[in-house]
Amino acid sequence: MTDFPVAETLDCGNAPLFVFVDHASNAVPESFDDLGLPKDVLGTHIGWDIGAAALGRNLSKRLKAKALFCRFSRLLIDPNRSLDKPDLIPFEADRIPIPGNQDLTAADRHQR
């Protein structure tokens, strides 16, 4: 994943707060083959928070704050979870199995 942009930053000022948009994108690195999901499924709310990136940008601008946007799908790995949580890499989302997340080894999880 070294050639994959994992984050985007925005610097709109020095307000004493920080905007973090953890589910800003539904992107999956090519090497993960869309986790075995059709593109239209990745484009739904299970792959990301639709509109969250635009909202984060607008908030950052209005509040004159710095912002950080995650540029990968929460289905790849959820940046809003602790490393020890079982749902860090979800097996399913809204009862839809995620084929690329089934039967992962400890090494697979560590790679992400």
Regions found by a protein language model. Name each.
Residues M1-R112:
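N-terminal catalytic or cofactor-binding beta/alpha core of small enzyme domains
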